């Protein structure tokens, strides 16, 4: 009799146990007063596996429990063979939560919204983009040429399509063919938010990057690394590695720099924005670590806004004739994280300095109060 009772007990428990192995429910909570729109959130893959150990990475879907529609996702590897995170693009209104379920199914094709690559055919450029904006960094082949530049470049766009390959193929990306162009001038500056050592009141530029590695390449997030040869930064031998991420739907890159140099003493660094000779609008907030620059309008091409958000304490901000700078410090082999990005008025989303400053403020608040992820 005891055996029969035990057997029936297992029979009732078995369906619930099996059900728990065939799905994972994720709660995404927004405790802020701001709406998160098209936000890319990260869920630890190990946590998914713990709830859904039999998941087939080629045959699962993520379902919005309210609308029953599929949610776009990406398996993030961070340069490793094993999956590290599940990335989801979601909308979560202020002070609400969203429930989604990971379950077996045939996933819909996700629209590519981020992309980047090494561009050997254009003197070692590395270019990357999302569905809003595009950027590039300069490589070794450009050094000691009349085109040489040190900072980050911006390519403006007014299309959600990926444009990098088409623009390089045409070779005339300084002309607007209807979807944007490259009219941003970098020259011998930090451009659109690059970082460099600042020794004895002088920016100590590195050479251009000499190695690159793509860690993830869309469809929702691109992450890559740029490595720089050792250089003499005002008497300090410095080596640098920069890890850059750009999410779909965002105006901003996340940049994590690691500087290697001798000694325990912190090294001063600056993040900079090139300043135009004509009148633009500069907005600085040292306490918040925020720099915004609404450039003067560039002929018929429109107006570009550049912004920087630092996560480390800023000792001072400076406006010179040629650059806008924010000064902070780094320790050897310890990562420093900041955000830099751009907007274009002709893209139709951000039309003036007031809107650009508001975007920066809201973006910073969202990084400080991110969406909260829980698995059930």
What positions do the PLM features span?
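Alpha-mannosidase-like glycoside hydrolase catalytic domains involved in N-glycan trimming
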Residues: 21-116
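Bacterial Sec-dependent N-terminal signal peptides
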Residues: 1-25
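Extended acidic/polar, glycine-enriched regions
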Residues: 80-121, 269-281, 287, 291-295, ...
């Amino acid at each position: 009799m005891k055996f029969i009772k035990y057997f029936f007990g297992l029979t009732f428990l078995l369906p619930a146990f099996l059900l728990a192995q065939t799905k994972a429910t994720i709660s995404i909570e927004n405790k802020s007063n701001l709406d998160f729109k098209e936000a890319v959130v990260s869920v630890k893959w190990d946590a998914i596996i713990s709830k859904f150990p039999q998941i087939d990475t080629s045959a699962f879907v993520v379902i919005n429990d309210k609308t029953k529609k599929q949610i776009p996702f990406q398996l993030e590897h961070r340069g490793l063979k094993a999956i590290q995170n599940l990335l989801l693009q979601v909308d979560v209104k202020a002070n609400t939560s969203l429930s989604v379920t990971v379950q077996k199914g045939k996933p819909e094709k996700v629209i590519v919204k981020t992309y980047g690559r090494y561009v050997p055919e254009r003197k070692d450029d590395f270019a990357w983009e999302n569905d809003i904006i595009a950027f590039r960094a300069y490589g070794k082949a450009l050094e000691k040429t009349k085109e040489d530049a040190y900072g980050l470049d911006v390519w403006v766009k007014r299309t959600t399509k990926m444009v990098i390959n088409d623009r390089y193929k045409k070779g005339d990306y300084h002309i607007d063919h209807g979807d944007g162009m490259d009219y941003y001038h970098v020259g011998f500056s930090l451009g659109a938010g690059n970082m460099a050592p600042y020794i004895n009141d002088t920016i100590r530029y590195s050479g251009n990057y000499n190695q690159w590695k793509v860690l993830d390449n869309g469809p929702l997030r691109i992450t890559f690394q740029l490595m720089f040869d050792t250089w003499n930064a005002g008497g300090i031998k410095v080596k640098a590695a920069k890890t850059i991420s750009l999410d779909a739907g965002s105006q901003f890159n996340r940049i994590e720099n690691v500087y290697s140099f001798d000694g325990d003493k912190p090294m001063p660094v600056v993040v900079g924005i090139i300043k135009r000779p004509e009148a633009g609008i500069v907005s600085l907030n040292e306490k918040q670590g925020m720099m915004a620059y609404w450039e003067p309008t560039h002929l018929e091409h429109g107006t570009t806004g550049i912004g920087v958000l630092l996560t480390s304490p800023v000792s001072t901000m400076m406006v010179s004739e040629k650059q806008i700078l924010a000064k902070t410090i780094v320790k050897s082999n310890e990562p420093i994280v900041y955000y830099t990005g751009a907007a274009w008025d002709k893209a139709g989303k951000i039309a003036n300095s007031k809107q650009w400053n508001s975007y920066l403020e809201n973006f910073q608040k969202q990084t400080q109060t991110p969406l909260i992820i829980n698995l059930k």
